UniProtKB/Swiss-Prot annotation:
The keyword Kinase does not apply. The gene is ypeA. This is Acetyltransferase YpeA. Belongs to the acetyltransferase family. YpeA subfamily. Keywords: Acyltransferase, Transferase. The keyword Signal does not apply. HAMAP family: Acetyltransf_YpeA. Disulfide bonds: none annotated.
Length: 141
């Protein structure tokens, strides 16, 4: 397995992977999300590749105060092999190298499998309520 930075030629393969991982939401256009990331620190957008196939992704961010991780997904046939752990570990190292003191990940409360993975990796529940406001409406995907 190789972990590397997203490249333009990964575009369609990544969107297909996100569909298989059930990461897409009607209010988020994944093509726009990728375009936005490519214009803003693409070095934190990582893919895991096995035999030339993109099998995992994580899209990281850092605002100078806190890091974040989105679109963490691993192809169903490749789960249980440590790919998600490796992607998060690489992202964390990149964030630490930038002086990032902490990382935040939003997870649906009912996603027990993923919550367990994050807890095993040292992530803790934060007693905060996450609020959001859409500033630019994407077309329904």
């Amino acid at each position: 397995m190789e972990i590397r930075v997203f490249r333009q030629e990964d575009f369609e393969e990544v969107i297909t992977l996100w569909e298989r991982c059930d990461l897409l939401r009607p209010w988020n256009d994944p093509e726009m999300d990728i375009e936005r990331k490519m214009n803003h620190d693409v070095s934190l957008f990582l893919v895991a590749e096995v035999n030339g196939e993109v099998v995992g992704t994580v899209m990281g961010g850092y605002d100078g105060h806190r890091g974040s991780a989105y679109y963490l997904g691993v192809h169903p046939e490749f789960r249980g092999r440590g790919i998600a752990n490796a992607l998060l570990n690489r992202l964390e190292k990149k964030l630490i190298a930038r002086g990032c003191p902490k990382i935040q990940i939003n997870v649906p409360e009912d996603n027990d499998m993923v919550l367990g993975m994050y807890e095993r990796l040292g992530y803790e529940h934060a007693d905060v309520l996450s609020l959001g406001k859409r500033l630019i409406e994407d077309e329904e995907y």
